[in-house]
Amino acid sequence: MEKDEELKLENVEISSYGSTDKGVSFLVELDNLSIFHAGDLNWWKWKKFNEKVQKREEREYKREVDKLMGKQIDIAFVPVDPRLEEHFYLAGEYFITEIRPALFVPIHFADNYDVTRFFKDRFNSNQTRVAEIAGPGEKILYTRK
């Protein structure tokens, strides 16, 4: 799929959104469950980027995420890339604040599992549960409220 396309396969609806790097991001809806996977859609605020490029990265990330406003997202997989150093949390914070998924699952953190603990400690709420991942192969159970 390319950006901004929709596909329906029996009871599964897939909508594609843009990325700020490679590929696309996806919203999958089935059986009254909605799952968003950001892929490489991230707020890439690299220290080596000048201010103009950093502002563009912010604008492009927010533009794609804002397309999800008004949609109920049950589960969201969003990058929290520690290579961005002190800016690693920006994409996740914006997504949680603006979209308010029921469950937020951090991705793109390699083996830096402390990042997931940081997110849980900082952003877990009655509105959005944040998954803390302790190691590879961990299972996360989602139940509706």
Label every PLM stretch briefly.
Residues 19, 83-86:
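Active-site glycine- and acidic-residue-rich loops that bind
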Residues 42, 79-83, 108-110:
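Catalytic metal-binding/acid-base residues of hydrolase active sites
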Residues 74-77, 102:
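Conserved acidic residues
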Residues 61-66, 85-94:
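A short, acidic, amphipathic alpha-helical segment used as a generic capping/interface helix at domain edges
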Residues 46, 85, 114:
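Conserved protein kinase catalytic core
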Residues 1-5, 88-145:
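Binuclear metal-ion centers of metallo-dependent hydrolases, dominated by the metallo-beta-lactamase
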Residues 1-72, 135-145:
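Core dinuclear metal-dependent hydrolase active-site scaffold
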